[in-house]
């Protein structure tokens, strides 16, 4: 399945905040379990009333901060990308795809936020993905005769 069975065995449940700390590579990942609910509440309050001219920045921040908090035992990346796109759509902006072939650049941009709390690299990356997503969509539409 899409949820890590070993984490289920430790009492973790899909859709629930994590109950344990996790290590990815050499580093502990995210907020301690006892801080997750408060940090998520603060994040949602921060982005709730963003001005229209700052929606893309807020979407990038929402995604980066969710990954930084790492609220779930598994599926944080998928959830963060989905939430970012939902936020964009709710604010009349198009969604985007984080393409597999550029994942190294994506992870580096997220690491830049984790290390320095800077969104510049992530915003640049996401803008490129937005353009690539919709260039491919337009190309496919024209190729299939929908552009007539």
Regions found by a protein language model. Give the residues of each.
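FIC/Doc superfamily catalytic core
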Residues: 1-74, 78-148
């Amino acid at each position: 399945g899409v949820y890590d069975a070993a984490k289920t065995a430790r009492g973790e449940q899909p859709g629930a905040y994590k109950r344990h700390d996790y290590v990815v590579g050499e580093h502990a990942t995210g907020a301690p379990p006892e801080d997750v609910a408060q940090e998520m509440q603060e994040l949602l309050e921060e982005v709730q009333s963003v001005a229209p001219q700052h929606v893309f920045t807020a979407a990038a921040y929402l995604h980066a901060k969710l990954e930084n908090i790492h609220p779930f035992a598994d599926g944080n990346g998928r959830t963060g990308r989905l939430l970012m796109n939902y936020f964009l759509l709710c604010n009349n902006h198009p969604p985007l795809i984080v393409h597999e072939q550029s994942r190294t650049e994506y992870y580096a941009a997220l690491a830049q936020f984790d290390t320095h709390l800077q969104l510049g690299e992530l915003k640049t990356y996401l803008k490129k993905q937005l353009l690539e997503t919709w260039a491919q969509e337009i190309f496919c539409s024209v190729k299939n005769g929908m552009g007539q």
